[in-house]
Curated annotation (Swiss-Prot):
This is Putative prephenate dehydratase. Keywords: Amino-acid biosynthesis, Aromatic amino acid biosynthesis, Cytoplasm, Lyase, Nucleus, Phenylalanine biosynthesis. The keyword Glycosyltransferase does not apply. Residues 5-180 form the Prephenate dehydratase domain. It comes from Schizosaccharomyces pombe (strain 972 / ATCC 24843). Pathway: Amino-acid biosynthesis; L-phenylalanine biosynthesis; phenylpyruvate from prephenate: step 1/1. Belongs to the PHA2 family.
Length: 272
């Protein structure tokens, strides 16, 4: 049997690369240039799995990832992966920095170091931290640096100037491990944590959904709300929760205009 394939936001050295290695160490790695490309490869079954960052412990929800998940019922969450996000500065010199390149999430995770060391530098967003490092390594003026990972510097032999510039030494990024195909009820119990996605045309329906959760002691661990783009001021809700049971899926779904059970997986976070 051939080895499974797992897609991640590349190039190699990104935190997504690290997540893929942790999630599926025996799978073949497939580096892709964007989150959209990662999900397209998964839904078209070019790969068997994918990792997608959804939350950072310092900077919150990864909004572009959630927007790509809106309305999808062709993929399933089967795991979560926690990746320590220790950021480094890569480049030629810190003496005359005019631009800092990185993925947008990284800027928010390193704001204290930036303010203290290069407060006047221009932020330039690129598709990944590894792409930022590759671009900064080609700069011959000494005016451009990148926020990236130590793995990226080591794998590509880039010049590493400063380590561990993140605001919080416990900084972590949480990834979902996804596979193709919607949720299949195989009669086995759900795992500890579940991911739900639903659209509500009126806010009063949210109260009804939460009443079901409260009555059955379902604990909401994460709630992300995104515009539905159907009608103004209506929303799509992404809910992660502990204690969801199969008989509650229909109970919750009857209050929703659309409802997708996006999978269940082992919880990796200690909440209590």
């Amino acid at each position: 049997m051939s080895a499974s394939k797992i897609a991640f936001l590349g190039p190699r050295g990104t935190f997504s690369h690290q997540a893929a290695l942790l999630a599926r160490p025996d799978s073949l790695l497939c580096s892709l240039p964007s989150f959209a490309a990662v999900l397209e490869a998964l839904s078209s079954r070019q790969v068997d799995y994918a990792v997608l960052p959804i939350e950072n412990s310092t900077n919150g929800a990864v909004i572009p990832a959630y927007d790509l998940l809106k309305g999808r019922d062709d993929i399933q969450a089967v795991g979560e992966v926690l990746v320590p996000a220790h950021h480094c500065i890569i480049g030629k010199s810190l003496e005359n920095v005019q631009k800092i390149l990185s993925h947008p999430q990284a800027f928010g995770q390193c704001s204290k170091w930036i303010s203290a060391n290069v407060p006047n530098a221009e932020f330039v967003s690129v598709s990944s931290t590894s792409q930022a490092a590759a671009l900064a390594s080609k700069d011959i003026t000494g005016t451009i640096v990148a926020i990236s990972s130590e793995l990226c510097a080591v794998e590509n032999q880039f010049n590493l100037l400063v380590k561990n510039i993140e605001d919080d030494s416990n900084n972590r990024t949480r990834f979902l491990l996804l596979r193709s195909g919607g949720f299949q009820d195989d009669l086995s119990p759900l795992k500890e944590k579940s991911l739900l996605q639903f659209y509500l045309s009126h806010p009063k329906k949210l109260s009804a959904v939460f009443e079901v959760f409260a009555a059955h002691k379902v604990v909401i661990t994460n709630l992300v709300v995104r515009p539905s783009c159907k009608f103004p001021w209506t929303y799509i809700y992404f809910v992660e929760c502990l204690g969801m049971e199969k008989h509650l899926i229909d109970r919750v779904g009857k209050y929703c205009d659309t409802f997708t059970f996006m999978g269940s997986y082992t919880n990796q976070i200690s909440y209590f």
